Amino acid sequence: MYIAIEGIDTAGKSTQIAKLQEHFSDAIITKEPGGTEAGKEIREIVLNAKIKSKKAEFLLFLADRAEHIQEVIEPNLSKMIISDRSVVSGVAYALVQGEISETAILHLNRFATGGIYPQKIFLLQLTNEELSLRLSQKKLDGIELRGIEYLLKIQDALIKASNLLNIELVLIDATKNIDSITQEILNNINI
């Protein structure tokens, strides 16, 4: 089963993936962007705000996604795969940027993934207040520097992207305690 943990920055994706790894010790744990060597370099370029063009950023993420699907996801489809972000994030960010048509976004992502999508998305949702608090407690990267309003638009776009891609979506209140969130995810994984 291929699942992805989605959510805006600080929602707790990494924490939940670490908890899930305790329950699925043989799972393939990966992330997008950055799940391959090429992806790590692409992630570094984007997070350090080295790319100014939103179209160039979109194309870099597509390149990472294609490589990630070919090198990590496709060879392991018979195993449990848990990904920190997925095609859903790529579509959501592109929708919010608004520089590329929805049709083109979906077509290019379908091309990059070969139609291989997670079977289920777990979206960790934050309130405006909780997001403000969490962001105030860390050094912000290039994407987080775009602001709270931008990140909340991304959160809404993650829901839209899941629907556009016809991927089953489980919404989770990320303000709950860590163990409650983990249990909710486990209850919704059908193996």
Swiss-Prot record:
GO terms for biological process: dTDP biosynthetic process; dTTP biosynthetic process; dUDP biosynthetic process. Keywords: ATP-binding, Kinase, Nucleotide biosynthesis, Nucleotide-binding, Transferase. One of its GO terms (molecular function) is dTMP kinase activity. GO terms for cellular component: cytosol. ATP binds at G7, I8, D9, T10, A11, G12, K13, S14. PANTHER family: THYMIDYLATE KINASE (PTHR10344), UMP-CMP KINASE 2, MITOCHONDRIAL (PTHR10344:SF4). Belongs to the thymidylate kinase family. Phosphorylation of dTMP to form dTDP in both de novo and salvage pathways of dTTP synthesis. This is Thymidylate kinase.
